[in-house]
Swiss-Prot record:
Belongs to the bacterial ribosomal protein bS18 family. Keywords: Chloroplast, Plastid, Repeat, Ribonucleoprotein, Ribosomal protein, RNA-binding, rRNA-binding. The lineage of its organism: Eukaryota, Viridiplantae, Streptophyta, Embryophyta, Tracheophyta. It comes from Zea mays. One of its GO terms (biological process) is translation. Residues 7-55 have a biased composition (Basic residues). One of its GO terms (cellular component) is chloroplast. Residues 4-52 are annotated as: 7 X 7 AA tandem repeats. GO terms for molecular function: small ribosomal subunit rRNA binding; structural constituent of ribosome. Residues 1-59, 151-170 are annotated as: Disordered. Disulfide bonds: none annotated. This is Small ribosomal subunit protein bS18c. Sequence repeats lie at residues 4-10, 11-17, 18-24, 25-31, 32-38, 39-45, 46-52. Pfam families: Ribosomal_S18.
Length: 170
């Protein structure tokens, strides 16, 4: 089978434009007389770094004996503060929690600070509940039904007890 190798030929016909014409909008694009003004002062970077420094310095050792360091990561109630509040890395937080637990076991730290906790609970409860007002919810019809049902139950129980006593006497 013989395949002839013919060179690629360009068509001699000119490029035909599509029949659809481009519709220009009636209003031309507005050209402003004044060019866009760039602000003379470039964007200033804030003085403070974006990532805040952690509370642990480079020389601080995370150890159960380092009480000044450990106390920074414990709340007033004696609970270990979360990583979000502490701004620590995962590794640092893990070491801090281990040090705090070790200090508690070796009685360097109390497990909970009960004095501050009671005070905190009292404040939290008063904030949540607000002042307490007693409402008179006495509905005489319901209480009468309840009392009559209770009386029926008591009388039925008394009858059963009497029947047992009589059967045991025989």
């Amino acid at each position: 089978m013989y395949i002839s190798k013919q060179p690629f030929r360009k068509s001699k016909q000119p490029f035909r434009k599509s029949k659809q014409t481009f519709h220009k909008s009636k209003q031309p694009f507005r050209k402003f007389k004044q060019p866009f003004r760039k602000s003379k002062q470039p964007f200033r970077k804030s003085k403070q770094p974006f990532r805040r420094r952690s509370r642990i310095g480079p020389g601080d050792r995370i150890d159960y004996r380092n009480m000044s360091l450990i106390n920074r990561f414990i709340s007033e109630q004696g609970k270990i503060l979360s990583r979000r509040i502490n701004r620590l890395t995962l590794k640092q937080q893990r070491l801090i929690t281990l040090a705090i637990k070790q200090a508690r076991i070796l009685s360097f730290l109390p497990f909970r600070n009960y004095e501050n906790e009671k005070q905190f609970q009292a404040q939290a409860i008063s904030i949540i509940t607000g002042p307490r007002h007693r409402k008179n919810r006495h509905i005489p019809q319901l209480t009468q039904k309840f009392n009559s049902n209770r009386n029926l139950r008591n009388s039925n129980q008394n009858l059963r007890n009497n029947n047992r006593n009589l059967s045991s006497d025989c």
